[in-house]
């Protein structure tokens, strides 16, 4: 335990040597807000490792801002018929989502190029699936119901490539276009 205290006191003395008086005053305020120098350093290391990390003080600051915004929106009438949209918890949630970059749906809505690329990819995949389906239909035997002399309703599989009539044999490879 004595080694731990010595470590922190040595660190504080080194910081005092290297920081200006104004920086030391700011550091002292941060230490007073967070409880100890150890908590401040652990938080700084965590933020250095993960820049998107929100500390408790960051979340509290977001909540305070959300409450102020909520109070302002409520005082000005809100502009929205639904009162639950102006709740501080909802505003805080939106502030935190904004701090983390927003939800994936919001990011897609904000990026028109990404939306356009997604629509193009969907159109291409639909066209490819349609083409593959039509080629498979033209090559594979298609079940076609025929009247059987035995019981009158037994379906048989007929090869569509052999059952083409002369009007559909004009080079379309058996693809039904709806014009026939």
From Swiss-Prot:
<feature type="compositionally biased region" description="Basic and acidic residues">
    <location>
        <begin position="159"/>
        <end position="169"/>
    </location>
</feature>
<feature type="region of interest" description="Disordered">
    <location>
        <begin position="138"/>
        <end position="180"/>
    </location>
</feature>
<protein>
    <recommendedName>
        <fullName>Uncharacterized protein ORF180</fullName>
    </recommendedName>
</protein>
<feature type="compositionally biased region" description="Polar residues">
    <location>
        <begin position="145"/>
        <end position="154"/>
    </location>
</feature>
């Amino acid at each position: 335990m004595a080694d731990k205290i010595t470590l922190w006191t040595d660190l504080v003395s080194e910081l005092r040597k290297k920081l200006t008086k104004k920086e030391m005053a700011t550091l002292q305020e941060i230490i007073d807000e967070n409880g100890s120098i150890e908590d401040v350093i652990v938080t700084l290391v965590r933020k250095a490792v993960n820049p998107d990390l929100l500390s408790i003080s960051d979340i509290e600051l977001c909540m305070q801002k959300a409450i102020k915004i909520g109070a302002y929106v409520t005082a000005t009438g809100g502009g929205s018929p639904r009162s639950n949209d102006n709740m501080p918890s909802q505003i805080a949630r939106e502030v935190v989502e904004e701090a983390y970059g927003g939800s994936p749906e919001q990011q897609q809505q904000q990026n028109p190029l990404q939306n356009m690329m997604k629509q193009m990819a969907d159109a291409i995949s639909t066209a490819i699936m349609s083409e593959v389906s039509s080629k498979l239909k033209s090559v594979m035997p298609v079940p076609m119901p025929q009247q059987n002399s035995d019981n009158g309703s037994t379906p048989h599989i007929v090869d569509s490539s052999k059952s083409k009539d002369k009007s559909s044999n004009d080079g379309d490879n058996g693809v039904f276009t709806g014009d026939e």
